[in-house]
From Swiss-Prot:
Gene that specifies this protein: gpsA
InterPro entries xref list: 6-PGluconate_DH-like_C_sf, 6PGD_dom2, G3P_DH_NAD-dep, G3P_DH_NAD-dep_C, G3P_DH_NAD-dep_N, NAD(P)-bd_dom_sf
Pfam families in UniProt: NAD_Gly3P_dh_C, NAD_Gly3P_dh_N
Any Gene Ontology biological process: glycerol-3-phosphate catabolic process
Alphabetical list of PANTHER family matching this protein: GLYCEROL-3-PHOSPHATE DEHYDROGENASE, GLYCEROL-3-PHOSPHATE DEHYDROGENASE [NAD(+)] 2, CHLOROPLASTIC
Residues annotated as binding sn-glycerol 3-phosphate: K109, G138, T140, K194, D247, S257, R258, N259
Entry annotation: catalytic residues: K194 (proton acceptor)
Taxonomic lineage from the root: Bacteria, Pseudomonadati, Pseudomonadota, Gammaproteobacteria, Aeromonadales
Organism: Tolumonas auensis (strain DSM 9187 / NBRC 110442 / TA 4)
A GO term from the CC aspect: cytosol
Protein name listed in UniProt: Glycerol-3-phosphate dehydrogenase [NAD(P)+]
SUPFAM superfamilies assigned: 6-phosphogluconate dehydrogenase C-terminal domain-like, NAD(P)-binding Rossmann-fold domains
Amino acid sequence: MDSAVALSVLGAGSYGTALAISLARQGQPVLLWGHDPQQVARLQQDRCNQEFLPDVPFPDSLQMTDDLAYAVSASRDLLVVVPSHVFGEVLLRIKPFMRPDTRVAWATKGLEPEHGRLLGDVAKEILGEQIPLAVLSGPTFARELAAGMPTAIAIAGTDEQFTSDMSALMHCGKSLRVYTNPDFIGLQIGGAVKNVIAIGAGLSDGLGFGANARTALITRGLVELQRLGLSLGADAKTFMGMAGLGDLVLTCTDNQSRNRRFGLALGQGKTVEQAMTEIGQVVEGYRNTKEVHVLAARQNVEMPICEQIYQILYQGKSAQDAALALLGRDQKGE
C-alpha cells in the first residue's frame, strides 16, 4: 500500500468494526471512522466495541477517528461499511477529501433507496467512472469474523489490480479466506436479495411451518435471486458461490441474522415497529424489500416470494394470507 494506513474503514457499526479488527489482527495499520464523536471516544477509551462486540479487544494497530477528512485522506484504499440507505450520502461526503489515487470498496449489502439501483451504479455516478471500485459479499456474521472464527467471502470489482490488492490485504490464512470473482453485478444482487428471503425464512419459522417450508423457501428464493441477477447481466455461477447460496443459507438459518429475527418476530404476531424495536439495529432487509420490488418491476422479473414479503411489510397483508397465496399459485415445472 502507498500510505502508513493500509485501509480506512468507514462505518463503526458491528460489521465495520469486525472487518477492521480482522484486518488489524494481521498487524495491518487500520483506521476506523465513526460518525458519532461520542461513540468514537468510547471506542478509543474501551479499546473494544462494547455495544456490538464487547468480548473482542481491538488490536494495537487499529485506531479510531471521527474526522472524515482525515480518514479519507489517510489511506489510498477505503472500505465503506454503512447501511445501504446512507451509502450515497456517505460517498457524497467523502468525495471532496479523496486523493487522486483513491480506490473505494464497500461491504454494504443493499440497493439504492426508492430507485432500487445497484450501489455500483450509485458509486460511479457520484465518484466518476474512473475510480476503481470493489464490493465484498458473502456469508459473514460480525461476531464470528471479529472473534477470528473461520470465514470465507468473495470480492469483485471494476479494476483487476484493486480487486487483487484488496483480496491480498484482507486474506488471513488463519481465519479469513477471500475469493476473487469477476462478477461485479452478481455480488451486489446476492447481498441485497438474500436479506429479503431471510425475512421470509423467519416469517415461515415464526408461523410454525417447519423445516420443509423453510428449505423450500430458501431454494425457490435462490431461483428468484438468480432470475433477477441474470436479467441484469450477472453470471449464473455466482449464485452458487459465497455471495449467493452461501450468504442466503447463512442468513436464512441462523438467528444471528437480524433479517431472519425480524421475520421471526413478524411471524409470531409482532408489528413491523415492534419487531424493529426488538432487533435494536438496522434491518437492511426491510428497505431492501421495497428496493427489490422496484428493481424487479423495472426488469419485468417475476419474484413471487419477494413480492409477498413486500405486501406483508408495506401493504398490510397477513403472513398467513401471503403463505396461502404462494401455495395456491398455478402448478408449473421446477
